[in-house]
Swiss-Prot record:
PANTHER family: TRANSLATION INITIATION FACTOR IF-1, CHLOROPLASTIC (PTHR33370:SF1)
Protein name per Swiss-Prot or TrEMBL: Translation initiation factor IF-1
GO MF annotation terms: ribosome binding; rRNA binding; translation initiation factor activity
Start and end residues of each S1-like domain: 1-72
Record GO cellular component, one term: cytosol
Species for this entry: Paracoccus denitrificans (strain Pd 1222)
Alphabetical list of Pfam families matching this protein: eIF-1a
Source superkingdom: Bacteria
Protein purpose: One of the essential components for the initiation of protein synthesis. Stabilizes the binding of IF-2 and IF-3 on the 30S subunit to which N-formylmethionyl-tRNA(fMet) subsequently binds. Helps modulate mRNA selection, yielding the 30S pre-initiation complex (PIC). Upon addition of the 50S ribosomal subunit IF-1, IF-2 and IF-3 are released leaving the mature 70S translation initiation complex.
Length: 72
């Protein structure tokens, strides 16, 4: 079984939600709900409102995603 193709988009964190989830506004104007990737949690990388992040999303559900990088 092949791994599904993930779409990556840059965005800005708009709001912090419970359980390490965030409301992210993508550069194309859409807002999604995203959670932090496990490696970011493990390395205790903090994400705050206003941070620029990279979000990867599955092609099946374009309303949810995973934050896999925080830009410096």
């Amino acid at each position: 079984m092949a791994k599904e193709e993930m779409l990556e988009f840059p965005g800005v964190v708009k709001e912090l939600l419970p359980n390490a989830t965030f409301r992210v506004e993508l550069e194309n104007g859409h807002e999604i709900i995203a959670h932090m990737a496990g490696k970011m949690r493990k390395n205790r990388i903090r994400v705050l409102a206003g941070d620029k992040v990279q979000v990867e999303m599955n092609t099946y559900d374009l309303t949810k995603g995973r934050i896999n990088y925080r830009f410096k």
